Amino acid sequence: MKFEELNLKDLILITPQVFADNRGFFLETYNREVFKKGGIDVEFIQDNHSCSSAGVIRGLHFQLAPYTQGKLIRATQGSILDVVVDLRKHSSTYKGVAKVLLDSKDKKMLYVPEGFAHGFVSLESCEVQYKCTNLYNKSAESGIRWDDPELNIDWEIKNP
């Protein structure tokens, strides 16, 4: 696996090694020791799976402390534009925005650490799976509007 830090501190794009032949493919999506060596030393305790029609925006979601969540995100069908915002007030990239294309064809994954808001737009019908470092907690649920004027995010679709 290849681990690449992106424009926001601690945001990591992961490119897995895919073994493909005429029968199909195999890849390892998570290995605690490999991730630890790649700079991601967390414990995932919940897996989620969502399905969205083309053009759907989900997010920007986050949970308040002490229920913050880190996430490992991948598109298992279709493609998404994944959008994250750094909400860590003491971070050098505070309020920074990153956009990453995740596609079921290239199988890249995105690690979003605790302290970020997360969302995505489905560029086609898609399924997205993500691992979380904390359980969902309804009382800690929060979010930022997708069209927040301060962030001014271009979701790269017509009529969001």
What residues fall within each predicted segment?
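Non-catalytic, conserved peripheral segments adjacent to functional cores
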Residues: 1-106, 130-160
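Conserved metal-binding segment of the jelly-roll/cupin
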Residues: 102-124
